[in-house]
Amino acid sequence: MRRYTISDIARMADVSPATVSRVLSNSPGVNKVKRAEVKRIIEETGYHPSSAARSLVRGCSNVVGLIVRDLENQYYSAMAVCAQRRLLERGYMTMIFSIGTKAEAEEKRDYVTEISHKFDFAGLLISVPSCDYFAAEGIRNSRCPVVSLNRTFDVACDQVAQNDFQAGFLAGEYLQKLGHESFLLLAGPADESVSCRFRMEGFIQSLAVNGRELDEENAIRGELSMDSGYELGVKLLEERFPDHLPTGVFANGNSIALGFLKACGERGVRIPQDVSLITVDNPAIMDMPGINLSTISVPMEQMASEAVDVLLERIERKREKKRFVALQPELIVRGSTAPPQRRCLPDNK
């Protein structure tokens, strides 16, 4: 059985391929007679347009690449689902790349450049730490439009992100309103991303507004992972603060917060009775029983939809001016924060 192409249908109907495409998508701009003729021929031939054919008519691919750090991380997996859903609504397919851990990303080095040159994407959405030098270089060298999703890069590309300074400020402000006077910041790695740095600066500024300072030794460095959060928690509770922990803790990432929460639970430290813990971002796991973490976040659906719309505006309208969209985060209060009650921690011996 012969497989007809969109060009075959256009030739048989004596119209252009673009007209056939408009009929297929039920778009305006085709008179009734021509529309009826095209539909008749499509029905007689049994023609079904492939995604490649639709792409050729549009003059570009209808596939968007989505690069995230690690799909095992709840944040990135939730982001991927939301972005894919929005792209599908707009008529685009998604190819997702999970780069892996920090070490794996460093080993792959120029993965963004390789992906953008290997595949004929209409555009790329990228959500990896902005301290990733090779990602930044890949954005500069990309063959297609790029939008950075909730990560702030010092490169000329469209960027959609939450206001990270405001996120950190809101976290510190809320802990102080609850009455906390001693604070601990799980800050992230020394080569932290721009996003992490802005959140840290916002948190410190919220203390300064009220005449407080964060002790330098209370800004704890570590990777933004559950393992790192757990290891830091164990070390802090057993070595650094064996008798009492600062009562207000801000974790600069939800994975490190989950690890810290586990360490506290294993050592009898009650959340929020002994320590209030607040973090950033809001994947579904944050609201699960036994976790129930207060957080500062922009709704994931809003952020992903905004990023997709910005990318497709550049693809479809050929917009040249770069855009930076800063979304304002909101406080989500759950069961991990409360006014301070006491500072003494249980005897773990």
What is each residue range found by the language model?
Residues 1-62, 75, 338, 348-349:
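N-terminal helix-turn-helix DNA-binding module of bacterial transcription factors
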Residues 1-5, 59-173, 241-244:
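Alpha-helical recognition/docking segments in bacterial nutrient-uptake
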Residues 12, 17-22, 56-72, 82, ...:
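Short beta-strand segments enriched in small/hydrophobic residues
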Residues 48, 88-93, 145, 181, ...:
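Residue-level detector of anion-binding/catalytic polar loops
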Residues 69-78, 96-107, 160-170, 186-234, ...:
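Hinge/beta->alpha junction and helix N-cap segments in small-molecule ligand-binding domains
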Residues 119-127, 184-187, 219, 241-253, ...:
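Periplasmic-binding protein-like
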Residues 235-348:
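Flexible loop/turn connectors
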